[in-house]
Amino acid sequence: MNIGIDKISFHVPNYYLDMTDLANARETDPNKFHIGLGQDQMAIIPETQDIVTLGASAAAKILTDEDKKDIDMVIVGTESSTDFSKSAAVIIHDLLDIQPFARSFEIKHACYGGTAALQQAHDYVALHPDRKVLVIAADIAKYGLATGGEPTQGCGAVAMLITKEPDLLAFNNDSVFYSEDVYDFWRPAGHDYPLVDGHMSNQIYIDSFTRIWEQNKKVNQTDSTDYAAITFHLPYTKMGRKALRAIFPEMPESEQQRLE
């Protein structure tokens, strides 16, 4: 039985800031943002929206009345929670009028929350193949005015309906994973903005990717030729390319060009 993403949608606000305008305001070269980071626009969240409205708006675009009857679980992966106790998933569950006998909860783990939610959804559908799980990844990234992280800010939400025999994408059962306790990025209680060591965070990203790449080759007996494409989580646009280039030495030039 295949399990995976049957439907997917996303939502971002109507407001954005052009990165050239931000560069001019900060008296810096726009190419630092456009080329150095690969960022052209920054989504801006209005005061009337939060991760709940972003997530509900994304999900509303794909769910039918029949889906809402079949959903047993609503999971929100976020590090921009609106409450220390109340889950955003519970509010979204109500806004979307999903049948009441469903689990609704939130997963917080920096950049990993949405992926963890997908793994949880997969396992549930494997045990309950006639039921569905709604997974939402929603965040509002804020670093403060004139900080190093300012040009990497943004906001948005992705909604995914996880089912058996999906129309869009089926998950393989070959995941590999890695954990390390580092303080490159965190936001303690009482802080409005995260504490970030940008250079360290970049290096941790690359090092973690190369370690998990080697582990994947070892466990699943794969190499780059087994992949049509590689999808990255992106703190900013260029980060994925930097990580990919870290494994280029093991590939012929033709393979490098294909993947990049």
Regions flagged by a language model, labelled:
Residues 1-48, 147-214, 219:
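Condensing-enzyme catalytic core mediating Claisen C-C bond formation in acyl metabolism
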Residues 5-7, 33, 62, 74, ...:
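Buried hydrophobic positions in well-ordered alpha/beta secondary-structure cores of metabolic enzymes
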Residues 9-11, 77-82, 109-114, 137-142, ...:
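Acidic, glycine-rich active-site loops and adjacent beta-strand->loop/helix elements
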Residues 32-36, 40-53, 79-132, 246-260:
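Conserved catalytic cysteine-centered active-site region
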Residues 58-72, 210-228, 247-252:
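Phosphate/pyrophosphate-binding loops at sites that engage ATP/ADP/AMP, CoA/4′-phosphopantetheine
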Residues 72-80, 106, 230-231:
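Short glycine-rich or small-residue beta-strand-to-loop segments that form or flank ligand, phosphate
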Residues 126-159:
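Flexible, glycine-rich active-site loops centered on histidine and acidic residues
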Residues 200-217, 227-241, 248, 260:
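A conserved active-site cap/scaffold subdomain adjacent to cofactor or substrate pockets
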